[in-house]
Amino acid sequence: MSLQVNSVAIMLVVLILLGVLSNNNSITISALILLLMHQTFLGKYIPFLEKNGLKVGIIILTVGVLAPLVSGKVQLPAFKEFLNWQMFLSIVIGIAVAWFAGRGVNLMSSEPIVVTGLLIGTVLGVAFLGGIPVGPLIAAGILAVILGK
């Protein structure tokens, strides 16, 4: 087996180092998995990940968010609690973020050039500001609104 040293491999190694230095397992593990796939016979599955990874990731994220409701650790609020301003604001913000993410997916599909900048910004936010890597969709959605897309 020979290693492929190219800009993609170097970028993934840099991401792994950033993830380790910032103690961010999400970046470290993701970049490590992709580097291993890129450097081995598993590379043939990268197009599958590219096509379906976002959908699968959103499903896993949604399961993780809903799991505390199912386990009973978080109780569903009583109807009267839906009438307070914090619950109302939470619902409105949830709707807005979902709308931004939908716009973001469309922008990322129609203008792939913005993906690089969004990914760099997201990685920096994850690595140094303690964020989580759902940022590209939201960032792309906000960018889409700013660009009038």
UniProtKB/Swiss-Prot annotation:
Q: Which organism is it from?
A: Mannheimia succiniciproducens (strain KCTC 0769BP / MBEL55E)
Superkingdom, according to UniProt? Answer: Bacteria
A Pfam family annotated for this chain is DUF441
A single cellular component GO annotation:
plasma membrane
Task: Describe its membrane topology.
Answer: Multi-pass membrane protein
Q: Which residues cross the membrane?
A: 10-32, 56-76, 82-102, 126-146
- Which PANTHER family does this one have? UPF0756 MEMBRANE PROTEIN YEAL
Protein location: Cell membrane
* Name used for this protein in its record: UPF0756 membrane protein MS1439
What keywords were assigned to this record?
Answer: Cell membrane, Membrane, Transmembrane, Transmembrane helix
Q: What is its main location?
A: membrane
Family per similarity comment = Belongs to the UPF0756 family.
Coiled-coil residues are: none
Q: Which InterPro entries match?
A: UPF0756_TM (IPR007382)
